[in-house]
Amino acid sequence: MCNVRTRHKQDNILTKKGQYTTMTLNDFLAYAATGKPLNTPDICSFMDEMSNEARRVTFRLNAEFHTQEEVRSLLSEIMGYTVPDTLRVFPPFYTDFGKNIHIGENVFINACCHFQDHGGVTLGDGCQIGHNVVFATLNHGIEPENRRFTYPAPIVLGRNVWVGSNSTILQGVTIGDNSVVAAGAVVTKDVPADTIVGGVPARVIKHI
């Protein structure tokens, strides 16, 4: 559990008016699950603290060689729970949060993947993730006056999903069991189970 005391007076639903706040990780995750903008001072301060913590540990992970057992230990520190013994990850690995990544059994993540997981990233059993894949669970407002606001939404991969190198999975996307994302795709919408998608934006190429 993370308890980060902010320096700002209350101006959101998580605390009482006029009081200083201590936001917990559970507070943040519950708020992010609503999809509301992450734009209050309390939330921004909490995100900064969590980003600093995640980057400190990922620096240790990426700075030198580690055995897979050591990699899993550091990832467990980043994610806040003991990751499965069947997880294999080739560093470098990047995240600016880390506490909302959920990984099943027999998952493989290749080098240089980026997890922006504030909205939640779930990888089902047997997923294979290629080089340089980006999971982006935050989006910005379209209107210029709202563009500084970020809005969270989860990304969910079912079982046995294969994501090719240099793909980007955007917020709110669910990819069904056994599907394949071709290299370089930008996935903006849900992917049905047992399909291959590719392109920018990604579209169904064939059924498996």
Question: Residue ranges of each PLM-predicted region?
Answer:
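Terminal amphipathic alpha-helical/low-complexity segments used for targeting or macromolecular assembly
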Residues: 1-86, 202-205
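Flexible, glycine/small-residue-enriched loop-and-beta-strand segment within the central core
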Residues: 93-103, 108-174, 200-208
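Short alpha-helix at the nucleotide-sugar/activated-sugar donor binding site of glycosyltransferases
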Residues: 128, 179-180
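Short arginine-rich
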Residues: 137, 189-194
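A generic "structured core" feature
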Residues: 162, 180-182, 186, 194
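Extended beta-solenoid/beta-helix repeat architectures
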Residues: 173-176, 191
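Conserved active-site beta-strand element of glycosyltransferases/polysaccharide synthases
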Residues: 197
